[in-house]
């Protein structure tokens, strides 16, 4: 009599790990001061990656492209042509 050794395949697929389940923390980018708001020198105006908004008058650009006020004054967000924006800080006139 013949004896057969049969090997059946698994009826259930092996369970792998999921590729979901992680999320990076927000970087808190964007405007930190509004148009027309009074700021002091050194105040952060806009946090960004790259130059989405360019520095204007009395505004500096940090190593991580953060825009900051160089003097005390009023913040103004302005357009440069059709597709560029800039932020400037204008000094407040001292009237008695």
UniProtKB/Swiss-Prot annotation:
Gene3D superfamilies: 2.40.50.100. Keywords: Ribonucleoprotein, Ribosomal protein. Pfam families: Ribosomal_L27 (PF01016). GO terms for cellular component: cytosolic large ribosomal subunit. Residues 1-9 form a propeptide. GO terms for biological process: translation. The N-terminus is cleaved by ribosomal processing cysteine protease Prp. Signal peptide: none annotated. The keyword tRNA processing does not apply. GO terms for molecular function: structural constituent of ribosome. Belongs to the bacterial ribosomal protein bL27 family. This is Large ribosomal subunit protein bL27.
